[in-house]
Amino acid sequence: MAGLKGLLFGGILFAMCGGLSEGQKKKEMVLSDKVGQLMDWASKRPVIRMNGDKFRRFIKSPPRNYSVVVMFTALQAHRQCVVCKQADEEYQILANSWRYSSAFTNRIFFAVVDFDEGSDVFQMLNMNSAPTFINFPPKGKPKKGDTYELQVRGFAAEQLARWVADRTDVNIRVIRPPNYAGPLMLGLLLAVIGGLVYLRRSNLDFLNNKTGWALAALCFVLAMTSGQMWNHIRGPPYAHKNPHTNQVNYIHGSSQAQFVAETHIVLLFNGAVTLGMVLLHEAATSDLDVGKRKIMCIAGITLVVIFFSWLLSVFRSKYHGYPYSFLMT
């Protein structure tokens, strides 16, 4: 009797092990098919286009031993999403840099879901804005850090690469296609300057023109203090359109980020305040008649008061709790 029980127990154990083995083999086959299909798509196009069915099969459904970075966007012309197109260009640069690097493996894939091709995915994730970047790890659900902070970090390929490295430990060296516009513009500028110097070679007094140098220095200072360098490094969007109200925001609500339009606004305000100060100085020191000096003084005061008030209001909107204001809140 004891021998019969042992034989029965052994049979059950063998059947269970066989079942587990078959299940494991099936799981490995499914995983192998998924990875093989993704590798095939990635070899043809570094950014894999996905609809709802592909998203559920290759990203939401187990098994998975790879990460997938997905850009949720709206690239169709009737959506009028300028930021989506700009972000897509940077995303393509990042994906191409990974695809054609010597370190390319099946650890990570890059995909895109367009709203017009996968609106059900947007509904599944309760997503109501685009573009949005999310990293789907090999195991578990995406955490808070797996959603890219676009408004803070911008969509430059280099910033996306740092975020990918932080979330997946995959380091991507971004390689941009050659851009000859910069060197051509620099060469044209040098040619124009060289031509002017050659034509005026008999009289180079214009190089000592204080007004010209002052204007050049002023333009440089206004550009730098308005945040142009930050834009160059981070690549932020020009503005943000609320998908619910269609209201366009030109000023970012956080002190940690800005829009390109915001830079232009601040540059205009700073320039107007500077012009007002120049007019006040000229009104006090010039030899013009009293009437013209009064007009210059009034214009200078008006420019300083109005545009400095607007500048402070912009500052207050970004740094919540800032106690000071002037005329405008």
UniProtKB/Swiss-Prot annotation:
Residues 41-169 form the Thioredoxin domain. Its main location: membrane. Glycans are attached at N65. Coiled coil: none annotated. Keywords: Cell membrane, Disulfide bond, Endoplasmic reticulum, Glycoprotein, Magnesium, Membrane, Signal, Transmembrane, Transmembrane helix, Transport. It is a multi-pass membrane protein. Disulfide bonds join C81-C84. SUPFAM superfamilies: Thioredoxin-like. The chain crosses the membrane at residues 179-199, 213-233, 259-279, 295-315. Residues 1-23 form the signal peptide. CDD domains: TRX_family. It holds the Pfam family OST3_OST6. Residues 200-212, 280-294 are cytoplasmic. It is found in: Cell membrane; Endoplasmic reticulum; Endoplasmic reticulum membrane. GO terms for biological process: protein N-linked glycosylation via asparagine. The keyword Metal-binding does not apply. One of its GO terms (cellular component) is plasma membrane. Pathway: Protein modification; protein glycosylation. Residues 24-178, 234-258, 316-329 are extracellular. Belongs to the OST3/OST6 family. Accessory component of the STT3B-containing form of the N-oligosaccharyl transferase (OST) complex which catalyzes the transfer of a high mannose oligosaccharide from a lipid-linked oligosaccharide donor to an asparagine residue within an Asn-X-Ser/Thr consensus motif in nascent polypeptide chains. May be involved in substrate-specific N-glycosylation involving acceptor sites that are near cysteine residues. Could indirectly play a role in Mg(2+) transport in epithelial cells. Accessory component of the STT3B-containing form of the oligosaccharyltransferase (OST) complex. This is Dolichyl-diphosphooligosaccharide--protein glycosyltransferase subunit MAGT1. It comes from Xenopus laevis (African clawed frog). The lineage of its organism: Eukaryota, Metazoa, Chordata, Craniata, Vertebrata. The gene is magt1.
